[in-house]
């Protein structure tokens, strides 16, 4: 979803001036009739231009339902806020992927208990092995002996979502 990871974190990232200019240019390019706002279709085009994929109906519905009902579409300020949050979420997910890949030394796409033990020896050497085993069992949500990226990402996000 658009805001799932970024919502829970404090704002720690700002767009560079050139990136900010690009977002404004995309807004203007998608606002073909110079209405001052993006319609639903304009917004979908902007997402394709900035992120390289067509947003799902659910994503677009979520964004459109969050805008001021007194406006006909997404104003520039709202658009910039949406894009910033999306970029924050994208950046966070990339960081989680990077951490997972660092622990997945054999590039299998999952972590075993041994991978977990090795990782914890590096980042928390005094942690008892019993605790590492408990953490592994908790993170391995389907109890298949492997921690997938999804399991890993879920564990890192656990308790951080807004209520």
Swiss-Prot record:
GO CC terms of this entry: cytoplasm
InterPro entries, per database record: EF-hand-dom_pair, EF_Hand_1_Ca_BS, EF_hand_dom, Myosin_RLC
Entry-linked CDD domains: EFh
Coiled-coil residue windows: none
Keywords: Calcium, Metal-binding, Repeat
Residues engaged in binding Ca(2+): 140, 142, 144, 146, 151
SUPFAM superfamilies in UniProt: EF-hand
Gene Ontology terms, MF aspect: calcium ion binding; enzyme regulator activity
Domain EF-hand: 18-53, 91-126, 127-162
One GO BP: microtubule cytoskeleton organization
Highest taxon, organism lineage: Eukaryota
Descriptive protein name: EF-hand calcium-binding domain-containing protein 11
Species assigned in the record: Homo sapiens (Human)
């Amino acid at each position: 979803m658009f805001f799932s990871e970024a919502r829970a974190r404090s704002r720690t990232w700002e767009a560079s001036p050139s990136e900010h200019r690009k977002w404004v240019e995309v807004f203007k390019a998608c606002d073909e009739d110079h209405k001052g706002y993006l319609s639903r279709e304009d917004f979908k085009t902007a997402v394709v231009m900035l992120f390289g994929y067509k947003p799902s109906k659910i994503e677009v519905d979520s964004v459109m339902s969050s805008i001021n009902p007194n406006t006909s579409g997404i104003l520039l300020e709202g658009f910039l806020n949406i894009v910033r949050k999306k970029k924050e979420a994208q950046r966070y997910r990339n960081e989680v992927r990077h951490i997972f890949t660092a622990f997945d030394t054999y590039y299998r796409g999952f972590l075993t208990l041994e991978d977990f033990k090795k990782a914890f020896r590096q980042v928390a050497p005094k942690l008892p092995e019993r605790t590492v085993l408990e953490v592994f069992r908790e993170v391995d949500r389907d109890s298949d002996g492997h921690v997938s990226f999804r399991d890993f990402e879920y564990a890192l996000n656990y308790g951080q979502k807004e209520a």
